[in-house]
A protein has these predicted regions:
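C-terminal cap of thioredoxin/glutaredoxin-like
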Residues: 49-51, 127-214
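N-terminal acidic, proline/glycine-rich, low-complexity intrinsically disordered segments
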Residues: 1-14
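Short metal-coordination and nucleic-acid-contact micro-motifs, chiefly zinc-binding Cys/His arrays
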Residues: 28, 36
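Cys/His/Pro-rich metal-binding microdomains
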Residues: 41
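Structural alpha/beta surface segment adjacent to cysteine/selenocysteine redox centers
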Residues: 35, 44-130, 203, 207
């Protein structure tokens, strides 16, 4: 550089551009679906985990009904378990009836109300579970009669078949579908919270995205 040449002054705007890290592309929200039976304790724990996941990850969960009663219709099970399966028709029928009359947005709140009574409060009278849950969610008490009406079974079976056909009849609830792949579980107890729930979700997405995984 000769004495007559001036040192170039850096352009502040260029410096700013160089110092600003490249923005990461916005990722799309993942879509998940969980099939549950309110009577199933494992599905209850998995649903609590997915609720935590929704807080810490970009994911939208759709909630759908399946039925342990349908799954075990022809199974060779004990008398005590058969008695439970006979009772378990009630809650899922009521959820189907409520969703038909009031929309799918009532499925999750009704499940939450039923599950809290069955699994946390240990209420064994399912008619009571149904009546109290309908009142909590603000739905008509008359929906309770659906628990003992078979006219809702066709819709229940369709929802059940849609989930179970993705994983096979050798599994029960819960069934979780992610990005076109479905599998039993994951069953986690206790349900992880916060970032721990998010990390499990990350791992679930990883394995679900592996070709041939089931």
């Amino acid at each position: 550089m000769s004495p007559t040449q001036k040192k170039a002054t850096p352009d502040p705007s260029e410096k700013t551009l160089r110092a600003t890290p490249a923005q990461k592309p916005r990722t799309r929200r993942a879509k998940a679906e969980m099939w549950f039976d309110p009577a199933c304790p494992w599905a209850w724990m998995t649903s609590r985990w997915l609720m935590e996941v929704e807080k810490v990850r970009d994911v939208d969960v759709t909630w759908s009904v399946m039925s342990l009663s349908v799954l075990n219709e022809k199974a060779d099970i004990s008398k005590s378990y058969r008695s439970l399966m006979d009772k378990a028709w009630g809650p899922v029928r009521v959820i189907i009836a409520a969703s038909e009359a009031h929309g799918d947005n009532v499925i999750k709140p009704l499940y939450d109300a039923m599950g809290a009574r069955i699994h946390r409060r240990k209420v064994r009278d399912y008619d009571r579970v149904i009546a109290e849950s309908l009142e909590e969610v603000g739905l008509p008490a008359t929906l309770a009669k659906a628990a003992h009406q078979r006219k809702y079974d066709a819709a229940l079976r369709r929802s059940h078949k849609r989930g179970i056909s993705l994983v096979g009849t050798d599994v029960g609830t819960p069934v979780v579908g992610v990005e076109g792949v479905a599998f039993f579980g994951p069953v986690v107890t206790p349900a992880p919270k916060g970032e721990a729930a998010g990390r499990l979700w990350d791992g679930t997405l990883l394995v679900a995205g592996t070709p041939g995984f089931y």
